[in-house]
């Protein structure tokens, strides 16, 4: 018995009957020889962590475009926070922590530069539309490794694709990431908005904070504990009705008072103009694309519009800004 087999046996001995065992994965699109040391989901976690797309998240906007100060969230810090929350829940519920972490680390790989305003404009101008969750899957299936993709397991790709609000992950680990994403962005975006002096903690609606908690720390603890208590030894990941209603209410309040506020929207038109300018330039100058993107058209028959959107979506905010005067 090698190290991987020992770890797989350990999983079977202590994990919940509802956990996704590494030894029972539905596998990869392209079969590979098993690793002697690492179970399959751990290999996926490592591949995502070492990918170019993951590294670029450090310079991609979460809510505030090019914020002044070192303590605002980026896509990378958000991703790490989602991973921490999700792993805490998965470990306590005796589910597969490696699968959970892999999904969490990969869930936002497809986000565009300039936050949701970048996604909005790419969805308008790309011939086949654009969503960050489908782009995240496209990155791991096609774009990474010069067009070869990361060849991740089915369960990780399913969790990445279905982390959105309307998604239905096929594993409990994917369901954990889906809820952890909401918990992270609501609480940490509140923290960033308070730092930006958009409002104070005391101005948050009491009807929601009396249930969720009156600080970021309280809310995180209460929401995580609620999920654990309502999901322990059950075949579903759920919150109590009161906690979920309060979370959804605060989420709506955040959309009205933060995401649609004048401060984060002040640069939105500028960001959309920059994305449009880049799209029009590369549609007319395909020869300026990196060779790996050109080869997607030559070798795989990908549409020019699709490949141009791939290239722009992969840019960091900083890199996109540096190209505006090309």
Residues covered by each model-derived region:
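Sequence-structural signature of the catalytic-core scaffold of metal-dependent phosphohydrolases
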Residues: 2-33, 49-55, 80, 84, ...
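Active-site flanking loop/helix segments enriched in acidic
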Residues: 29-36, 40-77, 161
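Alpha-helical scaffolds flanking conserved acidic
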Residues: 42, 93-106, 153-159, 172-176, ...
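Alpha-helical phosphate/pyrophosphate-handling elements in metalloenzyme active cores
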Residues: 67-99
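Internal helical hairpin/lid segments
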Residues: 215-287
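A glycine-biased, small/acidic residue-tolerant capping/turn segment at secondary-structure junctions
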Residues: 286-295
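C-terminal functional modules
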Residues: 309-317
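Conserved small/polar residues in nucleotide/adenosyl-binding loops
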Residues: 324-326
């Amino acid at each position: 018995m090698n190290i991987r087999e020992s770890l797989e046996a350990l999983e079977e001995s202590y994990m919940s009957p509802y956990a996704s065992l590494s030894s029972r994965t539905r596998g990869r699109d392209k079969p590979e020889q098993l690793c002697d040391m690492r179970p399959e989901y751990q290999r996926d976690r490592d591949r995502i962590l070492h990918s170019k797309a993951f590294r670029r998240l450090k310079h991609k906007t979460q809510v505030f475009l090019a914020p002044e100060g070192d303590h605002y969230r980026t896509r990378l810090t958000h991703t790490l926070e989602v991973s921490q929350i999700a792993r805490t829940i998965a470990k306590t519920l005796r589910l597969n922590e490696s699968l959970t972490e892999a999904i969490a680390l990969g869930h936002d790989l497809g986000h565009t530069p300039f936050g949701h305003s970048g996604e909005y404009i790419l969805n308008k101008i790309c011939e086949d539309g654009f969503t960050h969750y489908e782009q995240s899957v496209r990155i791991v299936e096609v774009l990474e490794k010069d067009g070869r993709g990361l060849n991740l397991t089915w369960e990780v790709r399913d969790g990445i694709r279905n982390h959105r609000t309307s998604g239905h992950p096929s594993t409990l680990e994917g369901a954990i990431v889906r809820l952890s994403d909401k918990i992270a962005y609501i609480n940490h975006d509140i923290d960033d908005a308070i730092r930006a002096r958009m409002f104070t903690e005391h101005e948050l609606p009491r009807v929601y904070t009396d249930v969720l908690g009156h600080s970021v720390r309280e809310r995180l603890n209460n929401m995580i504990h609620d999920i654990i208590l309502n999901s322990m030894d059950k075949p579903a990941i759920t919150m109590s009705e009161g906690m979920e209603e309060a979370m959804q209410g605060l989420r709506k309040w955040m959309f009205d008072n933060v995401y649609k506020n004048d401060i984060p929207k002040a640069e939105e038109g500028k960001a959309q103009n920059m994305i449009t300018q880049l799209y029009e330039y590369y549609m007319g100058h395909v020869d300026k694309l990196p060779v790996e993107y050109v080869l997607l058209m030559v070798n795989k028959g990908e549409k020019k519009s699709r490949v141009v959107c791939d290239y722009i979506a992969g840019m960091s905010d900083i890199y996109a800004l540096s190209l505006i005067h090309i």
